[in-house]
From Swiss-Prot:
Alphabetic keyword roster: ATP-binding, Magnesium, Nucleotide-binding, Transferase, tRNA processing
Organism: Rhizobium johnstonii (strain DSM 114642 / LMG 32736 / 3841) (Rhizobium leguminosarum bv. viciae)
One GO term (biological process): tRNA modification
Protein name: tRNA dimethylallyltransferase
Family indicated by similarity: Belongs to the IPP transferase family.
Enzyme Commission code(s) on record: 2.5.1.75
Residues the entry annotates as binding ATP: 15-22
Region annotation Interaction with substrate tRNA: where it falls in the sequence: 40-43, 164-168
Coiled coil: none
Domain of life: Bacteria
Lineage: Bacteria, Pseudomonadati, Pseudomonadota, Alphaproteobacteria, Hyphomicrobiales
Amino acid sequence: MENLLSTVNAILITGPTASGKSALAVELAKRHDGAVVNADSMQVYDTLRVLTARPSKEEMQGVPHHLYGHVPAGAAYSTGAWLRDVSALLPALRDAGRLPVFVGGTGLYFKALTGGLSDMPEIPETLREKLRTRLLQEGPDGLHAELAVADPAMAASLNRQDGQRIVRALEVMKATGRSIADFQGRSGPVIIDAAEARKIVVLPDRAVLHQRINGRFEKMLQQGAEDEVRALLALDMPAEAPVMKAIGVSQIVAMLRGEMTRGEVLEKGAAATRQYAKRQMTWFRNQMDDSWERLTV
């Protein structure tokens, strides 16, 4: 078994949903005595294994997988939290002689992993919860107006309906008395040196990708996605919770309420996935430079 630890510090694999990147990660991890590390912001949650395409035990093929399903559904989990988890994990992988193989479709995770993350301040949980509660109860308009008084330049740069970003800007201003823009220009430490990593972006043919997406969403319903969403609803998650925004949740909720047929769920769920994949493809083409290998799987 070949081990690349002496020549590269990690393998990074990204690409759109349903591109085959997870299978590629397992293949490379088996070849190079590696361990797969999740870099997908939805697959961190302990719910929706099927709907977020979290690898099954069979798909893992005995390869160690890390940072999958380790976050409670209702918990806040940021790019910074992911980086902290990665930083805590890497020494153990190194000690075990395992090459980290990062795989996922969250481009910001890879940018932060190789370029550092803005050094944002810690926010008191009581303040964060207070602002989130206001967002749920009042909507974003009043919070945006409040931000416009406290930080006019930042308020002007944000979409008035982007509640999460408005809350983030407000909580930083309230906690520190300074604009979030003051912190965004400061980067934290780089965890993976991009120059010493093998970097792969999987960009399949569009027609092939769409065919995979259509088939996969139907398979998800067959494998229990409906039961997953029913269990999620039983947790009484707020609508703003990130896990509630996973692709397919809103369509399946509509079906459970009798507002959509199974056929409509398949059609609309697959369409939403195709739109998401298109946004991912555009982002990767624009953000991943020539040092990233382009592969079709």
